[in-house]
Amino acid sequence: FASQYTEAELKKFEAGIYYDVYKKMGAHPMVINGVSGVSFSVWAPCAMRVSVVGDFCQWDGRRYQMNRLGDSGVFELFIPGLGEGDIYKFEIKNQKGEPMLKADPYGNYSEMRPNTASVVWDMNKFSWSDDAWMAAREKIDTKKKPMSIYEMHLGSWIRKHTEKDEEGNDIVGSEFYNYRQ
């Protein structure tokens, strides 16, 4: 299957100005030349090899080795027959030849803990309901507005646990904010 990236897109990516790269990176269900499957891509500039692994190949990194796109550090592969709900990771072979399993940094969905694999998910099926907010955002000059970056280590704030999940595990941070992922 042909690359899903154009030369112009790779140049924009290398320059750090490819603002829609999330539409290509990660796992995206699609049909190419009448064949249904999933297009995978990841940036791993120092990798010797990158493979897509999952139950569909018994987690064998030799089966679905990705194609390196020139010197961009981007690897990609289209795997026919895969689709929404399939779990996967990237097997990245480092400079020492050691394979490491990594979740997809652009993944849209993940397994529930304690498992850590990414899950193929079609984000095109999601119906966004933020049209008014997006329209208002276009009228704002963000370069002239303040920006807030909030970073904290929740562990350093723990004094007591006030909430537990369905399995009886403590939910950290329940007293600090009302949304957690």
For the regions a protein language model found, what residue spans apply to each?
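The feature marks proteins involved in alpha-glucan
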Residues: 1-35, 67-174
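Structural beta-strand segments of beta-rich domains
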Residues: 36-41
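Short proline/glycine-enriched turn/loop motifs at strand-loop junctions of beta-rich domains
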Residues: 43-50
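Beta-strand-enriched, solvent-exposed domains that form extended recognition/catalytic surfaces
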Residues: 44, 59-61, 77
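Short loop/turn segments at connectors of secondary-structure elements within structured domains
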Residues: 46, 60, 84-86
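Short beta-strand elements bearing conserved aromatic residues within extracellular beta-rich modules
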Residues: 50-52, 88
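Short, intrinsically disordered, charge-balanced linker/junction segments flanking boundaries
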Residues: 174-181
